Amino acid sequence: MFYNNIPNSPTEDFRVVDVAMASSAAPVFFPTYERNIDGGIIATDPSLASIVYSIDKTLGKSIENIRLLSFGTGYYYNSIKQDTSNWGAIDWVVSKDPDLPIISVTLEGNAQVSQIFSKKLLQDNYYRLNPRMNRDISMDDVKAIDYLTQLAKEYDMTECVSWINDKWNKI
């Protein structure tokens, strides 16, 4: 289920706390919430889904009216360095570089496709804010909080602020 507050949506009146609990119920890390799990399992980067909902014909909106500022959680380019040509099903699960490569490839590929298609659809009306990290950080690594805080403080927001000023102030 994609939660949104679009008029007449079945989720229009859902409470924010319920949406937050459901959308953060990442399998393995957190329990399901009212039979829902983290939407990142289906749409790691929900940009494309948000565009599709925004151009719903019942809303009478045009794609030209959409401005999308997409916030990432930071990325670390981590490719599979091994030769995978002889891998079987087990190798895609148990290999350690990266951990669980089939999941890593699936989630990262899903996010990249969403970003590529979103940019293709919206062109300059799409901006992705997603700082590059110099190391891989697992979702539950509390020891990385200081590093992430420092990364956020040092991140150059000039281009993003310029995009916001250019795109939002013209609407």
Locate each region found by the language model.
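Conserved catalytic cores and adjacent C-terminal regulatory segments
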Residues: M1-I171
